Amino acid sequence: MRGKNKELILILIYILIFVIAFTDLRYYLGHSGLWRLLHHASVLGLTFLCVMGRITSGSLSRGFLSNYLVFFVFYELLVSALQSMFVIPMIFIDAVPWPIVFAFFYDYARINKLPDIMGRLTVLGMTGICLLSIPNILIQHRVKNGGALYATYYCFAFLPLLYMFCARRISALFTLLVILLMLLSLKRAAFIIVVGGVFLYSIVSVYVRSASRKRDRMFVLIFAGGICAAVLGVLLINRLHLNILKRLMGIFSDGGSGRTRIWRIILEHFHDSPLTQKVFGHGFHSVFYKVQTASIKRFAHNSLLETMYDYGVFGLMMVIFLMLLIIGATLMMIAMKYKYAPMMAFSLFPMGVLSVASYFFEQSYIILPICVMWGIAMGSFMGNDHADSGDAGRMQGSQQYTYTPLPAQKSEKKMEQSG
């Protein structure tokens, strides 16, 4: 595939990632069939473009991680077919997209530079997501709509891409906006993810980007800023009469809003399953379709437990191995002070929290923008940024690699140099 065509497909896929978030936010606001149709069409179009991009790119551009992700997709499809759980089109909307997106961006970033337009697309897309999240948050004061609030998680899911492509001032502005939106949503998991993720991002960012003589001062400023933000947050909570603190304090006493009961029922069903289904699983979304919790169909609210029931212990081990690869890559980037280490560090919070208390690997929703970031960061780290062989070559490659920043980033650097 020619360079221009590959870049065009990349841009179209990146735009579709935002379109998927837009349509998802609108669908859960009023459950309109039109928005659901547009959402499904966007996801299927995204998957088709990623598959075509991978097929036409040639085998030489594919790395171990991308092949592993594709193997995981085939495993999901095979198990689902054998267990008569090959649900069309939902299996191609929920199960297939996120590994394929991860693999596509990983392979692309290994051998290609990213177009500068992705920064502008990120700002426009993030603006739209934050604006569309406002009515989803406000609706909770009139009717109970958990899906509408869950869709607002796209706000923090796109933050690592914002940090990756945009200037610090723009990133800081959107970070404050996302923290405020998640605070108003009263969603405990979202609040923990944003606060913890931003804190970890800040710490790693200082370690990676600051000289050793300035690092201690920057750490002190981060802690001081965190304390000030906490005080202002408490004042805002009291002023607006929000009960987020009460909900955080009750995160264990209320059984995770009924999650522990759901987990117990699923584990009982898993224990009663035949050995082959324990090892290889019951198939796509079997928890939703086969396990009745409280007489209604629902997911496990635990991505790892959901994966174990749907795809067995073997499938769970594959997901855990992938998580270990991501954690290992993050630690390597931090050790080598790689430019994308802070974004990878941020992503550990949504991956960890949502995997044990919500939805993550079983649905291609909130995970999609995070997979884009993982693919770009890990692909560039293992590919064109590290053309030389060996650990010494890798370190040298990371120091020699030059990144062309956006105009706003260039102006910031000039101001820092002049200061």
Model-based region annotation:
Residues S253-Y311, F321:
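Long extracytoplasmic/lumenal interhelical loops at the membrane interface
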Residues W98-Q140, G146-Y207:
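Alpha-helical transmembrane segments of multi-pass inner-membrane proteins
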Residues M344-V356, F360-P407, G419:
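Transmembrane alpha-helices of multi-pass inner-membrane enzymes
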Residues G3-E7, S57, V313-G352, D385, ...:
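Hydrophobic transmembrane alpha-helices and their immediate junctions
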Residues M1-L77, C166-R169, F381-G419:
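Transmembrane signal-anchor hairpin modules in multi-pass inner-membrane enzymes, especially those
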Residues R36-G45, G63-L78, S84-D107, M126, ...:
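Aromatic-anchored transmembrane helix interface
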Residues R2, I11-L12, L159-N238, M317, ...:
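Hydrophobic alpha-helical segments of polytopic membrane proteins
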Residues R213-M218, V231-I265, Y289-V291:
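Flexible juxtamembrane loops connecting transmembrane helices in multi-pass membrane enzymes
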